[in-house]
Amino acid sequence: MNRIVRRTLQTAVRTASPWSLGALNHVAIAVPDLDEATSFYRDVLKGDVTGKEDLPEHGVTTVFVNLPNTKIELLYPYGEKSPIAGFLAKNKKGGIHHICIEVDNIKAAMADCEAKGIRLLNKGNLISLIDK
């Protein structure tokens, strides 16, 4: 009995996490024509579409499509060094660039992922992009 309790406790300690997953915040789609994509979501699908927002520090222009339970972020290159331009060079028709899932402790989640060998693309505060 003692061995089982010890093994259970060891497993619990090993699998405990200082952070947990939350809701899906948004799905980001890189698009080759932002006006066409915006028109599609607004006029054809009758989506609640925001205006364009240039984010030169991130090399993107964004438009959000607000859905009842999440958002779609349309991404278009801004400037010559845009990471979206590189993505579109490989994916001419565009496609899903990333998903954003909320966590209850971003710093702990980043540290934990990095410790597990997961490459982090950005170690800064990402809240400014999505907390509108």
Name every feature range the model reports, one short phrase each:
Residues 3, 17, 25-28, 73-77:
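Short acidic/polar alpha-helix capping motifs at helix-coil junctions
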Residues 71-97:
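Helix-adjacent hinge/juxtasegments
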Residues 57, 77-80, 100-104, 127-130:
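Short, surface-exposed, polar/charged, turn-prone segments marking secondary-structure boundaries
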Residues 1-8:
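N-terminal chloroplast transit peptides
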Residues 9-36, 94-103:
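N-terminal beta-strand motif that seeds the catalytic metal site of vicinal oxygen chelate
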Residues 88-118:
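Short, solvent-exposed interaction modules
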Residues 16-18, 40-41, 87-90:
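A short alpha-helix capping/helix-coil boundary motif
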